């Protein structure tokens, strides 16, 4: 029963967020963009409305955007060339320049806290005798590589991502601000394989009823991540005609906006990450952020986290003490696999941001699932196991999901503006969603692109609905032709064949004459050079004689 209560809480919130109905032909109002009523309460476990979440995001957005650009939060470490652990496809790469990542090479431009001697330095005080843990995996009170002697807890298997990636000898330091997440053109069969593998991780082995609920929760987290990435790339899209980056409303509506459940899952993920940050707020106040950056960074973190509302999630209903350990272990293992699947992405920039965001969601799940509300020592133990890269990933992921929510509201304004200026054509476009016309369900799944380019899978609740139920396919022109039209078309084709054969025949007939002219011209040039007559003078003489 407790297991059911755990995941039922998630489902109540997620179900209230999602609207699985078909795309209606009725005009959208300002309170019903993408068929979501913003004044609707999210649910019994999420005592907050969409409108209130938008207000929270408006309050924290400017400060959060500045926070992730500070010296501490703008750098991340990962292995861009780690082999894919799931299939043997490690030689592929994206040839587009937009896929590349500019790694940190000029160390003089990097703050002291990110210098190699701080990142990779080891000494007796900074190495744990049992595990040999370096400063890069030090705890929150050692974020700047400071050496302190204190009793560390025994290692716990509570990680939802592979933290060893941060200490890999082949890992490189990247500046997230210098490598923004935007449309790269990466897609096709390989990217579809990536997302297919990610969604297939949502296959829990145990047959308990609670795992059906866990499957839905897992799906909404991944769907929210996928929809958020699609929103980012739609919001920062390269217009090949103007050469400028900007929002692409049509792409957003095709990938996200015409699917209310995807929009809802973005808000769902916003709530998950926001609650995780709110939950560790008391511990963040005791974190030291490196000398001159300490006060400024702490103030910005406080300004962001203090505005979060505890009503966004009621974890007392979601995370009980007697959660089935088998379910939680399976959930943890599968989400860790999701972070590892990112090593299979051929686009370096897509891989980088995929790693950052899956690390952020993994950190959120660790905080929400593993921090026991009734045990202060257990909570402190979980916080002590957080690495600085998990904290960096957590805040950058919150910035990404916050930017998605902000972009959704911006796309809403663009949507209504176009509806007012050209109601008939724009309305028909958004209702019909012609990007998917002419595709069968199988073709759509096989040829869809990843990140922004691959349409997200529909919610399982709508599997039994007609796939094109929301489309109004225009009547096709009859393919029957009259006898006169057929005769005319045949004559045109025969005439084209005749001219082609005539051209080939004339080429062969004129070949000897053309070869003779070529030989004489070369011989004339050679002879003039032999007798000492410059070619240039000879040409001038010919011109003069004319």
Curated annotation (Swiss-Prot):
Keywords, sorted A to Z: Disulfide bond, Electron transport, Endoplasmic reticulum, FAD, Flavoprotein, Glycoprotein, Membrane, Oxidoreductase, Redox-active center, Signal, Transport
Needed co-factor(s): FAD
Entry-listed glycosylation sites: 337, 422, 449
Pfam family, one: ERO1
Cysteine pairings via disulfide bonds: 84-344, 94-99, 137-161, 144-290, 347-350
Annotated InterPro entries: Ero1, ERO1-like_sf
Top-level division of the source organism's lineage: Eukaryota
Active site: 347 (nucleophile), 350
Keyword Zinc annotated: no
SUPFAM superfamilies in alphabetical order: ERO1-like
GO biological process, one term: protein folding in endoplasmic reticulum
Enzyme nomenclature, EC number: 1.8.4.-
Compartments where located: Endoplasmic reticulum membrane
Subunit structure comment from the entry: May function both as a monomer and a homodimer.
Family, similarity comment: Belongs to the EROs family.
Name this polypeptide is given: Endoplasmic reticulum oxidoreductin-1
Species in which this protein is naturally found: Eremothecium gossypii (strain ATCC 10895 / CBS 109.51 / FGSC 9923 / NRRL Y-1056)
